[in-house]
């Protein structure tokens, strides 16, 4: 039984500061009164100081950094974070509406192993039953900062957190009326143009009510010759009301719509002929999401309380030709999620120690409705005579409880914690006749109870430098798609023999922060047992057995003003990650995993003089492999490494007749380096990367 072990864990956690106090044999001294302050939810108001005080690997990127680096998508923004790999669009993940990121060698397709949030609300359709981002309902233009917690976060946020927590913070409501209108225009080598318009306007009234309207879009053609259009609209309405100086209520209402083409992969012969062509004229991804959230927060002295409630309603559909057949397939899906999350933190003193205990609970209910339809297909007329193939419905009820306690003893901080997950998932899968009547069906359900301990320790060498180490256990339930499937004969169960994913994460590292230099260095090790591996060609899963991921991350930002005031306009940044990700059991033991680079890095220089800002940046990654029997489709084989250089110049018209106007011009892939990736899924093939691309940024603040 897991529950008795859970009770023992909680009891030990609660007694932990008392044990430290009892063990303190130092002489009694008179101390000045100390005011303890509860921190509460440490995802709130993420900044460099919070990174310094976090006992794990963590990186926060602010909006101005993203602009200076010329990032025009969330994928490009995340590439600047140590440990993250964000591949080019490929396969069924081949659209601007999807998001694929892999952390520390973990699989990147649709970001399945990181808990991705927007303002604390899960971004995925269904956090437990379908934790993927084939539709990622967020846009870079509406983001204030990106907070990437790679270690020491699993106890508070889960499941699906072996790859850490990524929280996109939307733009904050200004204290006074203000707004920005901006437009980024990208021009590809083939003359195709893509526009990214953004609007932000808001302010706070004298009575404490704040309102803001955010809009971000992507409209136009990509760099492929055909079937590469994007039409994305992302709008968010935010409200906040300060009840008094300690309490406030915040609300979000959000709508996201996307209709994007997927140009598809090429065989090696087609790629050699023209890597930018598209021979799949009817593949697409479309969808929409409506969501709302309300949060009440209270913080006064030693107490902090937060209550978050949210509801999401997501629809997505993808249509694509099935390679090697004369069939076309669509996959409409609907998901609804409702959740409530109370959290409470209390700071207290016990003898010479300062403590903060935090407890939280979440109840989440999600439902799914999934279907697959097929049609006859040829490349000229497209799909015709659509008929039903399968349908499925599922639901999950999940309870999660966490408790952790931070104890500060001199220069040391000790943070034990435990998370308890109780999950029940059901799935009904039906094979349909062409007229949508049921041929046969199967029903399955699975329940999970998991106790997930964590422990972090941090040593404060001084006010600028911390050293940390941590351990955390993560857990991921089976997804709806892993529980049952169909073939031409009927529906059948696929979960026999499959085990939930479990992983042990270890880190040791350091943070440094002063007015001129910020630095991070982390050694990591992930012991991933019972990792589920997807066979993209057959769309089935198996327990690979185990994988291990180990490596090192290093990053810094440095302002040369530390050397001389005359150099204060020059800033440098760089980060690099070395990862070794291998199978540690089974027939592939010792072999590298697919679709990850052992070495990834980026660097840049920012130079500001008067009203000019000049930027240059570099991104590079080593080669990858897509293991499998080489064939004419291009699915399998080596993927060469590459490096890309970008430049940008901008001018701020402040203190002129055009006050508020900013204009920037840049070039991505300056030397027009040709590179590619592969996809081993049902679409498959080779995918060329973005060629030399020019972009123009214009914005006006009012």
Tell me the role of every PLM-derived stretch:
Residues 121-150, 237:
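Short acidic/polar hinge/loop motifs at secondary-structure boundaries
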Residues 180, 191-263, 284-295, 346, ...:
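Transmembrane beta-barrel wall of Gram-negative outer-membrane proteins
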Residues 244-246, 253, 347-366, 392-527, ...:
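Structural signature of Gram-negative outer-membrane beta-barrels, strongest in the C-terminal barrel
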Residues 43, 50, 75, 79-122:
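Extracytoplasmic beta-strand/coil segments of soluble accessory domains associated
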Residues 199, 295-300, 304-320, 460, ...:
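Membrane-embedded beta-barrel scaffold of Gram-negative outer-membrane proteins
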Residues 318-320, 390, 429, 438-446, ...:
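Outer-membrane beta-barrel domain signature, especially the mid-to-C-terminal portions
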Residues 344-347, 351-354, 408-414, 422-423, ...:
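Gram-negative outer-membrane beta-barrel transporters
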């Amino acid at each position: 039984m897991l529950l008795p072990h859970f009770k023992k864990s909680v009891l030990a956690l609660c007694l932990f500061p008392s044990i430290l106090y009892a063990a303190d044999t130092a002489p009694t001294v008179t101390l000045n009164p100390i005011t303890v302050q509860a921190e509460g939810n440490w995802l709130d108001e993420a900044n460099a100081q919070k990174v310094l005080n976090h006992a794990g690997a963590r990186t926060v990127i602010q909006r101005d950094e993203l602009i200076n680096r010329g990032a025009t998508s969330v994928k490009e923004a995340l590439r600047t974070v140590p440990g993250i790999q964000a591949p080019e669009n490929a396969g069924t993940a081949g659209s601007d509406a999807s998001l694929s990121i892999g952390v520390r060698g973990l699989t990147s397709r649709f970001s399945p192993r990181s808990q991705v949030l927007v303002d604390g609300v899960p971004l995925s359709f269904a956090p437990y039953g379908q934790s993927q981002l084939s539709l990622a309902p967020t846009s870079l233009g509406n983001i204030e900062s990106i907070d990437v917690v790679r270690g020491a976060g699993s106890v508070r946020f889960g499941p699906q957190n072996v790859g850490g927590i990524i929280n996109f913070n939307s733009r904050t409501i200004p204290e006074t009326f203000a707004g920005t209108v901006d437009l980024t225009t990208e021009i590809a080598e083939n003359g195709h143009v893509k526009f990214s318009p953004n609007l932000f306007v808001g302010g706070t009234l004298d009575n404490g009510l704040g309102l803001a309207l955010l809009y971000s879009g992507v409209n136009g053609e990509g760099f492929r010759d055909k079937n590469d259009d994007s039409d994305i609209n992302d709008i968010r309405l935010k409200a906040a009301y300060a009840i008094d100086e300690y309490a406030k209520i915040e609300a979000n209402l959000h709508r996201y719509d996307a209709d994007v083409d997927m140009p598809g992969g090429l065989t090696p012969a087609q790629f050699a002929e023209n890597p930018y062509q598209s021979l799949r004229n009817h593949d697409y991804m479309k969808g929409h999401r409506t969501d709302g959230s309300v949060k009440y927060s209270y913080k006064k002295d030693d107490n902090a309380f937060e209550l978050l409630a949210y509801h999401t309603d997501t629809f997505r559909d993808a249509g694509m030709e099935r390679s090697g057949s004369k069939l076309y397939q669509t996959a409409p899906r609907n998901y609804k999620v409702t959740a409530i999350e109370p959290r409470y933190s209390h700071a207290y003193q016990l003898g010479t120690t300062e403590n903060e205990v935090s407890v939280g609970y979440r109840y989440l209910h999600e439902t799914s409705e999934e279907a697959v339809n097929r049609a006859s297909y040829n490349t000229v007329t497209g799909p015709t005579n659509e008929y039903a193939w399968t349908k499925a419905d599922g639901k999950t009820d999940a309870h999660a409880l966490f408790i952790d306690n931070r104890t500060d003893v001199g220069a040391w901080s000790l943070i034990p914690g435990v998370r308890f997950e109780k999950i029940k998932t059901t799935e009904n899968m039906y094979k349909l006749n062409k007229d949508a009547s049921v041929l046969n069906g199967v029903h399955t359900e699975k329940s999970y109870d998991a106790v997930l301990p964590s422990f972090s320790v941090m040593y404060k060498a001084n006010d600028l430098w911390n050293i940390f180490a941590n351990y955390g256990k993560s857990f991921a339930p089976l997804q709806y798609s892993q529980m049952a499937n169909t073939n031409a004969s009927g529906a059948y169960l696929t979960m026999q023999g499959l085990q939930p994913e479990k992983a042990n994460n270890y880190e040791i590292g350091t943070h440094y922060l002063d007015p001129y230099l910020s630095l991070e260095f982390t050694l990591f090790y992930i012991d991933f047992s019972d990792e589920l591996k997807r066979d993209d060609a057959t769309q089935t899963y198996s327990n690979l057995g185990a994988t291990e991921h180990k490596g090192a991350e290093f990053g810094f930002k440095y302002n040369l003003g530390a050397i001389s005031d005359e150099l204060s306009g020059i800033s440098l940044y760089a980060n690099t990650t070395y990862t070794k990700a291998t199978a540690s059991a089974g027939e592939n033991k010792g072999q590298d995993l697919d679709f990850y680079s052992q070495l990834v890095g980026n660097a840049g220089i920012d130079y500001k003089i008067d009203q000019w800002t000049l930027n240059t940046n570099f991104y590079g990654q080593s080669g990858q492999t897509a293991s499998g029997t080489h064939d004419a489709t291009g699915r399998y084989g080596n993927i060469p490494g590459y490096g890309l250089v970008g430049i940008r110049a901008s001018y701020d018209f402040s203190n002129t007749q055009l006050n508020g106007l900013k204009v920037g011009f840049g070039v991505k892939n300056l030397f027009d380096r040709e590179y590619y990736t592969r996809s081993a899924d049902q679409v498959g093939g080779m995918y060329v990367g973005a060629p030399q691309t020019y972009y123009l940024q214009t914005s006006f603040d009012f």
